[in-house]
C-alpha cells in the first residue's frame, strides 16, 4: 500500500513550537491522512518507508533572481523550518492512526524546499507481507 497526502505547513515560521501548536498540527496531519485513506491503515507488522517534503514559503524580500534560484532548487533552505522537528511531529501524529507504532518505520527521507504555497507532503509506503511469509 502507498499513501500520499498533504497538510499545510503551519510550522514554517520562526516560532516556538508550543505544546498546543504541536497538538493542533498533529491533529491536522491525522485528519489529512484519514481523509486520503478513508480510515484504512498499514498492517501492524508491516515495515514502512516515509518520505516527507517540507515546502517553506519563500521570503518576501527575495529578489526575482533569488526566487528563480529557490524555485530551481539552487538555493538551499538552511534556516526554517526545523526539518527534524517537523519529521518527528508528522511521524508521531500518524502513530496509532496510519500504523501501530513508529518502530515500523525502517526508512525516513526528509527534504525541504522553497514554495509559494507552504505545505508538507507525506508519502508512506509499506511492504505487505506475502501469505507464504516472505517479504
What would you call each of these model-derived segments?
Residues 1-135:
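Acidic, proline/glycine-enriched N-terminal capping motif
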